[in-house]
Swiss-Prot record:
HAMAP family given in the database record: AcpS
Name of the protein described by the UniProt record: Holo-[acyl-carrier-protein] synthase
Keywords: Cytoplasm, Fatty acid biosynthesis, Fatty acid metabolism, Lipid biosynthesis, Lipid metabolism, Magnesium, Metal-binding, Transferase
Protein task: Transfers the 4'-phosphopantetheine moiety from coenzyme A to a Ser of acyl-carrier-protein.
Amino acid sequence: MIYGIGIDLIEIGRIKTLMERQKKLPERILSKDELTKFESFSHEQRRAEFLAGRFACKEAFSKALGTGLGKHVSFQDINCQNDELGRPYIRYEGFKVHVSITHTENYAASQVILEKM
C-alpha cells in the first residue's frame, strides 16, 4: 500500500552558492557513505549536482513520510546510495522506498514513493 509520495526540485546554482558560503554544508546534508562519494568527484560542478540531487532526494523522502525534515527525521537519517546499475535507493525500516533523481544543467529533482511493508 502506498504510504506517501514526495517530490522536490532545487536549483543547482543555489547549492553552489551555499557550498561557497558554508564549507561544512556537505557534512550537514550527506551521510558518511554519501560524503565519500561526493569527495570522489574532482569537478565542483559534479559535486554541486550530486549534493543538489541528494538534497532533493532527502526533501522528497521527508515529504513522502509526511514529517518534513526536523524533529522526526534529519538529513543524516536518510542515506541514498546507488545499486550496481546506478539506480538510487534508500533503505528505511518498515517501508519499501522507490527513488528517482534527475539533473539538468540548472536543476536537480527527486521523487520518492513510500510503500508500507
